[in-house]
Regions:
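Long, aromatic- and glycine/proline-rich binding clefts that accommodate carbohydrate-like moieties
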Residues: 85, 135-186, 193
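Alpha-to-beta junction loops
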Residues: 56-64, 80
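Extracytoplasmic/periplasmic substrate-recognition and gating elements
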Residues: 35-37, 74-140, 189-192
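Short helix-initiation/N-cap motifs at beta->coil->alpha
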Residues: 41-55
Length: 216
């Protein structure tokens, strides 16, 4: 609705949750809720528990990453029954942007063998190993090493094209990675509450705005 820059500003605490532009985002979301676009009791399912709705034909689409492809294939859906599309443009005046989090490796600050850990890190992020690890028959993800090869997989290729050329507005992480932890926690609770009780929007936004004033 508002684009990448607005998202970053909201995540940084620079925009009020009661801003009319935030409300417009929820208004767009409310249209989907009111038309019954979500399965019943959606708030109770993990992403793994939601996949059978796709497999059994009880849901037509799911907003999820490439990691869901392997279990969907294992459940019996071949590529003739699966497809991928980028989230639709809501405002033609706003450049398309995407959420595409990057998974990272870390060495604990109190690790006892940091030198060997660093060598392992160099090994695992090498172009060759990133190609192997992220192949379609392995993790099925896009490698983080720019010199790695992207496996010739239908969905990996589509994801690569989307992030490299079809997201001119920018690429962000997930909500709970972009926002400070405390704000993200309260924000997620508010978003989940809205999906079940959309009439609570004013109360939700006031609560999140109060949290913004305290957290930032």
């Amino acid at each position: 609705t508002n684009g990448y820059d607005f998202h970053v500003q909201l995540a940084n605490g620079e925009i009020a949750w009661t801003d009319p532009r935030v409300r417009q985002t929820f208004a767009n979301w409310r249209e989907l809720i009111d038309m019954g676009a979500f399965v019943k009791n959606h708030q109770t399912y993990s992403w793994q528990e939601s996949l059978p709705f796709i497999v059994n034909g009880d849901a037509a689409a799911i907003l999820i990453g490439n990691f869901a492809v392997a279990p969907l294939r294992e459940a019996g859906l071949n590529d003739g029954k699966l497809d991928f599309y980028q989230f639709v443009s809501i405002n033609p005046d706003v450049a398309l942007a995407e959420d595409a989090p990057t998974d990272t490796f870390h060495i604990p600050s109190l690790a006892k063998n940091k030198e060997n850990a660093k060598e392992f890190m160099r090994f695992v992020v090498s172009a060759e190993n990133q190609t192997l690890i992220n192949a379609g028959d392995a993790l099925g993800q896009l490698p983080i090493n720019a010199q790695s090869a992207v496996d010739d997989d239908k969905f990996l290729n589509q994801g690569f094209a989307m992030l490299s050329t079809n997201s001119p507005g920018g690429v962000a992480q997930f909500f709970d990675r972009d926002f400070p932890a405390e704000m993200a926690g309260m924000g997620m609770e508010g978003l989940q509450e809205f999906m079940v009780f959309p009439d609570n929007l004013d109360e939700i936004l006031e609560r999140l705005e109060s949290a913004r004033a305290d957290i930032y």
